[in-house]
């Protein structure tokens, strides 16, 4: 059973030889492969090289296109700079005044360099891994993308002061995401991640008003193309987790800040699994083997065995390689303790 087969079987509720391991590796991957982060973000072959190397070196079951949240924002007009070996920096947001929303148009992925690059990354994965790994593309979720083009503080006040304009922007963002999903899946994606990171900052009422239906629409489109859907929201999503599950996403990431998920398990549908939730800093980066083991076992029990092994968010670049290798080894230990699904 290879990594692709293992991941798909586990998601579907079938047998697997061990628990799938899906760590989020971005800055860690670039550092491990000796690649400048600017190149990791901007050169598809370099990002793919780093991710494939990490998948081999750390027994990861997936490869993905994550590096930063700015591809769509740049296409909408947010101006960025790319430091030599650091995350991209915002120089000017696309929506400075609320009236700028009136000029927004649905993106055509082929017209924008970084959107084309993501499709190229998927094509490289498809050609170079030959169905071995679970390939995951990415789009920004509606609210996260709005924050990327507006500024997170302004975006949050806009929800109250300019709801009509925000709805218009979110509709355009959602249609743009749909347009971006299609070529990614056609290029060879098995899964599309929806990164709506900021949704943990809003109330359940605001999540339902501005985010839920749009995320569900993205999930439905992904499914219509025959791919799996994953939702990643940073922070404590306890208050909105029931709604997130109702989007129909196949994989729901659980941040370490989220309260125990036991009460939500009854809402997990057939073919839905969680992913998480070890703390990337206190557990993976700074912890020892016993702390890592305890964290993995705790969440796996909490999730009733319906969880992909991962951290709650990105593995830090300061994580010792030995800690990540031990973390990966827990996939076998978890499978030995629990029958898969």
Question: Which residues are covered by each model-predicted region?
Answer:
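Membrane helical hairpin/interfacial module
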Residues: 58-71
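Membrane-interface helix-loop-helix modules in multi-pass inner-membrane proteins
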Residues: 95-101
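Active-site loop segments of alpha/beta catalytic cores
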Residues: 1-30, 35-40, 50, 54, ...
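Loop-to-helix transition at the N-terminal end of transmembrane alpha-helices
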Residues: 45-48
